[in-house]
Amino acid sequence: MRLLILAVGKLKQGPERELAERYRARFDDLGRKLGFRGLDVHEIAESRAREAPARMAEEAAAIIAQVQDGAVLVTLDERGQSLGSTAFAAQLGRWRDEQVPGTIFVIGGADGLLPELRRKAKLSMSFGGATWPHQMVRVMLLEQIYRAATILAGHPYHRA
């Protein structure tokens, strides 16, 4: 199963980008041993439309254009379900074992995600009730994906 993060906005050079890349590389090393075929991050350009609904619609169209048939769509949204690390790992493991071709995680821009896009998601996840900057959400998601791989591998990184 291939993993893809579609993130609206660009992560500039700096500590957040370095940390995100570190977790992505760690996952690649471990994930391949677990049957995952890699983890990619694609940045979606932020819309320049004047009104929020138009921005969300443009960003949603760019996101949907990258969703492959049969892939599981997971949105990151403050209204989503808060999953513990072990539950998240178990879900990724189930999708892998069901031979889902890919899982696509979507991180919206400043205006959030178009409701129609949220409805297409098999799972909507939240990192708690707080609103987080998309740069932090990307790092947090990459860390949780890496942590999920360590849980599936029985690696001591996750000490619950």
Swiss-Prot record:
It comes from the Bacteria. It catalyses: pseudouridine(1915) in 23S rRNA + S-adenosyl-L-methionine = N(3)-methylpseudouridine(1915) in 23S rRNA + S-adenosyl-L-homocysteine + H(+). S-adenosyl-L-methionine binds at residues 76, 108. Signal peptide: none annotated. GO terms for cellular component: cytoplasm. Belongs to the RNA methyltransferase RlmH family. Homodimer. Specifically methylates the pseudouridine at position 1915 (m3Psi1915) in 23S rRNA. HAMAP family: 23SrRNA_methyltr_H (MF_00658). This is Ribosomal RNA large subunit methyltransferase H. It comes from Rhodopseudomonas palustris (strain TIE-1). The lineage of its organism: Bacteria, Pseudomonadati, Pseudomonadota, Alphaproteobacteria, Hyphomicrobiales.
